[in-house]
A protein has these predicted regions:
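The alpha/beta-hydrolase serine catalytic core
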Residues: 75-235
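Alpha/beta-hydrolase active-site loop
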Residues: 31-51
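Alpha/beta-hydrolase fold nucleophile elbow
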Residues: 51-62
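Aromatic pocket-lining residues of Rossmann-like dinucleotide-binding sites
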Residues: 9, 71-72
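The serine-hydrolase catalytic nucleophile loop
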Residues: 1-6, 163-165
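Conserved alpha/beta-hydrolase
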Residues: 4-26
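Glycine-rich nucleophile elbow surrounding the catalytic serine of serine-hydrolase chemistry
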Residues: 60-70
Length: 237
């Protein structure tokens, strides 16, 4: 998602930055909780501003959306939030973690999780605090005092996992000019789709989501995002 969106924005004349949070990718082995991630986001934004990029578009995906909003960098002109988690969700951690990992969390307060992404990292570390941060996201706290417009995009899978419902609940808190847009499910997602960790989605629900996306003739994320940023943060020539 970030790669394709980044390519689209660069073609439109924007400079982009992607970075590894603490505990992710090539960064240090920190326990992953929201507070350090928020500081990382602020630091990255501040560094960009120091390089002369004082008009910024902040992009966040799922839990990263809450991190981006709570970071509240001064240079942010707008936010693009893709399938954001903007409210509490119920998780069955038994579907996510092994018995050994659950025992480690119970007795030691932390455990390691294999990183099956394309990252150079082999594993990352989480704690009980991580689970609390993921379970108890507050959309009200994330949006309180926000004054710049926000684009929120959801696809049909978000209806099955409850993410769309969380956005509906906080819609009245969005700043003036904000937009919630439904977009098409990404190509090839049927074979590789995994829901937000711990939120069970049965095969029938995946079929429903794909059918809904295919029949609605929805726009693709990159087109929606490109139109949005050109409106609120036009490229300086």
């Amino acid at each position: 998602m970030f790669d394709s969106l980044g390519r689209t924005l660069r073609r439109a004349g924007y400079a982009t930055l992607a970075f590894d949070y603490s505990g992710h990718g090539a960064s240090g082995d920190e326990i992953i909780t929201f507070d350090p991630l928020i500081e990382d986001f602020r630091s990255a934004s501040g560094w960009l501003a120091d390089q002369g990029f004082a008009r910024q578009i902040c992009v966040g995906h799922e839990f990263g959306a809450a991190v981006a909003l709570r970071s509240r960098p001064p240079a942010a002109q707008t936010y693009v939030l893709v399938s954001p988690v903007l409210g509490p969700l119920s998780y069955d951690w038994n579907l996510v973690f092994s018995d050994v990992q659950l025992s480690d969390l119970e007795h030691h307060g932390a455990t390691t999780v294999p990183d099956d992404s394309e990252s150079v990292r082999q594993q990352f570390t989480i704690s009980k605090r991580t689970l609390a941060d993921m379970s108890m996201v507050s959309g009200e706290d994330a949006l309180r005092g926000l004054s710049v417009p926000v684009l929120i995009t959801h696809d049909s899978f978000d209806e099955e996992t409850g993410l769309l419902d969380r956005t509906r609940e906080i819609f009245h808190l969005l700043p003036d000019g904000s937009l919630v847009e439904m977009t098409a499910a990404p190509d090839g997602i049927a074979g590789e789709y995994t829901p937000v960790d711990g939120v069970p989605v049965i095969d029938e629900a995946v079929d429903r989501a794909l059918a809904a996306s295919g029949s609605a003739h929805l726009p693709v994320l990159t087109d929606v995002a490109a139109e949005w940023v050109s409106r609120w943060v036009p490229v300086s020539r």
